[in-house]
């Protein structure tokens, strides 16, 4: 009866309960996330929490880099937490249900880029979905994943190629593609891509 089942969840609960907490935190442009060590209860990710550790989310964080940081954080905290439980010093604090948000599983349909989004939202989404399933658009009939991009303040129509540096208009500002991957090809820099692929300023891409 004195066995405690705990779980490490990759968010600061009750924010982002559910299947994709790291991706949703990046996509939502949260400034921080972390881990919660909680007691397992029947309802999803809603058990009382004994420990939080926070970590900041920078503009450079993508799913791959942030999940690595979170794993390292978790492995450093779990030993200490188990000792606290073993010594009967664990205090489990109930979560505030009114603050709960849900990180629903990433759906494949989310990976298609919508140029009507704002540039900062698109960059966040590209980072959140890297490396899988990735964020893609189509150019000359082939599907291209954007693996790295940054926001720029050029303005133009959503989806319009504004500059030969591969800057594309969004509903607010624009993004500059820095790295990308054609279907069946390796990830490459924009410079390498543009050597073998012509882009025409003024073209609207899907």
What residue ranges belong to the model's regions?
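Acyl-group handling in specialized metabolite and lipid biosynthesis
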Residues: 104-117
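An anion-binding loop in the catalytic cleft
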Residues: 116-206
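Short secondary-structure boundary/capping segments
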Residues: 27, 41, 103-105, 136, ...
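A generic structural signal for well-ordered coil/turn residues at beta-strand boundaries
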Residues: 31-34, 45-46, 51, 107-109, ...
């Amino acid at each position: 009866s004195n066995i405690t089942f705990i779980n490490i969840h990759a968010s600061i609960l009750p924010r982002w309960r559910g299947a994709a907490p790291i991706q949703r935190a990046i996509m939502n442009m949260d400034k921080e996330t972390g881990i919660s060590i909680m007691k397992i209860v029947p309802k999803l990710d809603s058990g009382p929490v004994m420990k939080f550790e926070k970590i900041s989310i920078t503009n450079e964080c993508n799913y791959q880099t942030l999940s690595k940081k979170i794993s390292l954080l978790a492995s450093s905290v779990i030993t200490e937490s188990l000792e606290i439980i073993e010594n009967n010093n664990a205090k489990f604090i109930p979560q505030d249900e009114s603050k709960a948000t849900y990180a629903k599983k990433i759906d494949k349909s989310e990976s298609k880029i919508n140029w009507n989004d704002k540039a900062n939202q698109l960059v966040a989404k590209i980072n959140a979905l890297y490396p899988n399933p990735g964020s893609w658009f189509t150019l000359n009939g082939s599907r291209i994943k954007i693996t790295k991009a940054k926001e720029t303040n050029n303005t133009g129509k959503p989806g319009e190629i504004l500059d030969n540096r591969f800057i594309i208009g969004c509903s607010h500002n624009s993004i500059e593609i820095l790295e990308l991957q054609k279907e069946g090809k390796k990830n490459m820099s924009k410079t390498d891509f543009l050597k073998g692929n012509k882009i025409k300023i003024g073209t609207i891409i899907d």
